[in-house]
A protein has these predicted regions:
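Domain-level signature for soluble enzymes in the chorismate/prephenate branch of the shikimate pathway
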Residues: 1-139
Length: 139
């Protein structure tokens, strides 16, 4: 073992973590990096897993979306937070940019259906309606 390996391992154990729901690169991950770049992000699949990560000591902090300026409050968080044992200590704002993508050569008038996550569709509904594009939840 190289002497630096022990130092790296010790520093790794000392690094505090911030749990978030989603994958690396998700908006919640971006919010973690913007608000607390000193913390190591810990990706979790669900909001329940984020809360469990903090309660079990796997992470010291959680980054949870409470509200979306387009979609409104995040109902799951308002249901989970009161019984979680966690409380809000800070907030950050992350701008969300939604892109409509298609295969090369397809132009906007050719698009008739947009598939996306169920939460995202209402956020893009005005644009979709203006362009006669049917919204369809991705499975």
């Amino acid at each position: 073992m190289h002497p630096n390996d022990a130092v790296r391992e010790k520093n790794k154990k000392m690094t505090k973590k911030i749990a978030f729901q989603g994958a690396l690169g998700a908006y919640s991950h971006e919010a973690c990096n913007a608000a607390r770049p000193d913390l190591e992000p810990l990706a979790c699949k669900t909001f329940d897993q984020v809360i469990a990560a903090v309660n079990s000591g796997q992470a010291e902090y959680a980054m949870l979306p409470v509200e979306n300026s387009t979609y409104g409050r995040v109902a799951d968080i308002h249901r989970l937070l009161p019984k979680s044992g966690l409380h809000i200590i800070d907030e950050t704002f992350t701008r969300v940019r939604i892109s409509l993508m298609a295969n090369q050569g397809v132009s906007l008038p050719d698009v008739t259906v947009a598939r996306a996550h169920l939460v995202l569709l209402p956020q893009a509904q005005k644009f979709l309606d203006e362009h006669d594009i049917r919204a369809e939840p991705a499975v």
